[in-house]
Amino acid sequence: MNKIKLPPDVDFHEDIHLLVYRPRGLIDEAAINNILAVVERLEIGRRNPFNRFYDMSGATEVKLDFKYVTDASIHRRLSHRGRKSVKSAILAKDWDLLHYGHLLELLTQGSSIKVHVFQDRNDAAKWLGVPVELRAARASGEETRSRDAHP
């Protein structure tokens, strides 16, 4: 089985079927395109679906627009069609990220991708069914990172 080298802001927890994305700084089309490419590479050939936790608390600037977010959401909705249901939790406190997160919630309704936006890490962990410690561990340097993921 081939391994996928993950970028530094992505962890994959094979044991609990969870991808964690913790970007820092600017969130723009390039950043979103990069994480979508990682997600799609991991989805190829996987029998087990995996949930996603997007911790956007490290974002300092947002440069996105409505058309791009809509197009990216439609692309994901179509590329995930026919797959088992997954959850995508977005932790956001920035107004722009909250706005775009809620837009994603609306655009994915009725699809196999269930998106929910949270302002509280504990609520996101509970919704995903994972330990809250896992969500916060990397920020304190305690998490053992998986740098490679099997597709």
Residue ranges and their predicted role:
Residues 1-151:
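Amphipathic, Lys/Arg-enriched alpha-helical "gate/interface" segment within cytosolic domains
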